[in-house]
Amino acid sequence: MKISNLLAAFLAFSGGFFCASAEVPKVNKEGLNELITADKVLMVKFYAPWCGHCKALAPEYESAADELEKDGISLVEVDCTEEGDLCSEYSIRGYPTLNVFKNGKQISQYSGPRKHDALVKYMRKQLLPTVKPISKDTLENFVEKADDLAVVAFFKDQKLNDTYTEVAEVMKDDFVFAASDDKELAKSLGSNFPGIVAFTKDAAQDSDKLVYTGDWDPASIADFIGVSSIPLLDELNQMTFGKYQQSGLPLGIIFYNSTESRDELYDVFQPLAKKYQDTLRFAFLDAVRYGAVAKQMNVESDWPAFVIANLKSMLKYPFPTTELTAKAMTKFVGDFVDGKLQPKIKSQPIPESQEDLVVLVADNFDDIVMDETKDVLVEFYAPWCGHCKNLAPTYEKLAEEYSDDSNVVVAKIDATENDISVSISGFPTIMFFKANDKVNPVRYEGDRTLEDLSAFIDKHASFEPIKKEKESVPAPDLEDQVAVEDEMADEL
């Protein structure tokens, strides 16, 4: 691929760039910042050389970069084994990660198919107008053609236009956006001027129009659109779970095992879904197909069943019986909203004794990890995870190395059998909880060798480390680090 004139100039005169191959330029922090500022549309691949998924993506990414060059769209890459600070700055948690920038800002993280055609189509879409002008005559057709939520704003002010366009740029992959300066049209839809109306296809709503009444700022408008797009009472599956998770609202999950049961439960929960639509959402889950999710939600496998899950903290509030009557559900949901319920925490038994490698469970996690007199390194693992098994002998040796240091704890926890408040996106995940800063744990992103893990502890330690003399331990086989979604998403 011929590199564009702009990139060629940067390569020649800026120390921020160097060529990874003839196809896709590799950039460091300085070079990436220059590109973000200069390029109208840019995709950045954050990767690791050892990552199998990254290797599979490489030819597709290179061919897409070649085709998109004529459109003035740049595709570049960042090697996270060389640019660790840069990857941390962008909160890279797995490889490959594809971030998209437009007009100097990150607008999205690409999650579509990692194929040439899909990449090209997605990036060319970024060049299209984000907000479509609309009139009274074209409104109906605009709304009907929308696959999901259709958002229409009414204003004349340029500042309001800039704010609305900023939101639309970030959310345009999921929704369609239009704008009008017609005051009478806004009034006929029940909106103020300026104002925003979201058109929904949710049958559980009383109206197909949701009117925004909040402040005209990007965060508030985005929250309104995000929440409006989530059905009040829908089916939970692989396609819809992400929406519920991204909303930030607690989710009431209704387990059913027959069509008749679902129909009866709809009548019970639909009024509650409408009443509490600003507070939580509700969804049905087929217990015959997805019964294993009940275990993750701390629910007994008796149907029907109901649980409210906080998808941020992953705290679960299961209803204790199968008697899901309107009266019982009204009280239970009301008590949750009023903060009267206590979550049910799943925990393995606390070990009677501990070795050099401390075993954590949910019931002792805070006592050990949040101890402000200790630095604590924690491995979050799954018993079935091959990478975790490969790491085990090295991690045990690491614990032995720091066993004489009373200020350092090396620990592990089975994240599949214990409820934890830490967000885990893959196994193993290793985090360092500093004695003087428990709120901001440091995620380990390096090679899983004894030397690198030990250096990581020493770098971030709150105290002068005291270690036993080390014996050499062979590095575990670092095959492709496969990021795994959280347990519930896997089951779905």
UniProtKB/Swiss-Prot annotation:
Disulfide bonding pattern of the chain: 51-54, 385-388
Main subcellular localisation: endoplasmic reticulum
UniProt EC number: 5.3.4.1
Subcellular location per the Swiss-Prot or TrEMBL entry: Endoplasmic reticulum lumen
Positions of short motif Prevents secretion from ER: 489-492
Site location (Lowers pKa of C-terminal Cys of second active site): 448
Keywords on record: Disulfide bond, Endoplasmic reticulum, Glycoprotein, Isomerase, Redox-active center, Repeat, Signal
InterPro entries recorded: PDI_thioredoxin-like_dom, Prot_disulphide_isomerase, Thioredoxin-like_sf, Thioredoxin_CS, Thioredoxin_domain
Site (Contributes to redox potential value): 52-53, 386-387
Stretches assigned to the Thioredoxin domain: 23-128, 323-462
Pfam families the UniProt entry points to: Thioredoxin (PF00085), Thioredoxin_6 (PF13848)
Biological processes annotated in GO: protein folding; protein folding in endoplasmic reticulum; response to endoplasmic reticulum stress
Positions annotated as glycosylated: 161, 257
Molecular functions (GO terms): protein disulfide isomerase activity; protein-disulfide reductase activity
Protein known as: Putative protein disulfide-isomerase C1F5.02
Organism annotation: Schizosaccharomyces pombe (strain 972 / ATCC 24843)
